[in-house]
Amino acid sequence: MTDISVPLTFTDAAANKVKSLITDEENPNLKLRVYITGGGCSGFQYGFTFDEKVNEGDLTVENAGVQLVIDPMSLQYLIGGTVDYTEGLEGSRFVVQNPNASSTCGCGSSFSI
């Protein structure tokens, strides 16, 4: 499913990194999937994986010719958020900036509502 008003931002930096990784894998059908699971030090944890398919009900956000996919259960926790890619002293990684999180852990990989 693709919405006209996109409730999640997929930054150019994240899209360009996904495009680079897809090229390295030599599989143009790959999409970056972001999801939420229980766990981490704050209750919920962000996860990222590559997926070849879009399931019924998934939201897709496209940028730079690549797709970010979010399942409906995870989307409710990510509305208004941003998926970005950062490079810094702590390494390179995809990150979620989530306005719905009431608190996050020090590394930013888990949050609470």
UniProtKB/Swiss-Prot annotation:
GO terms for molecular function: 2 iron, 2 sulfur cluster binding; 4 iron, 4 sulfur cluster binding; iron ion binding. Keywords: Iron, Iron-sulfur, Metal-binding. Signal peptide: none annotated. One of its GO terms (cellular component) is cytosol. Gene3D superfamilies: HesB-like domain. One of its GO terms (biological process) is iron-sulfur cluster assembly. It holds the Pfam family Fe-S_biosyn. Iron-sulfur cluster binds at C41, C105, C107. Its cofactor is iron-sulfur cluster. Binds 1 iron-sulfur cluster per subunit. Homodimer. NCBIfam families: iron-sulfur cluster assembly accessory protein, PRK13623.1. Belongs to the HesB/IscA family. Required for insertion of 4Fe-4S clusters for at least IspG. This is Iron-sulfur cluster insertion protein ErpA.
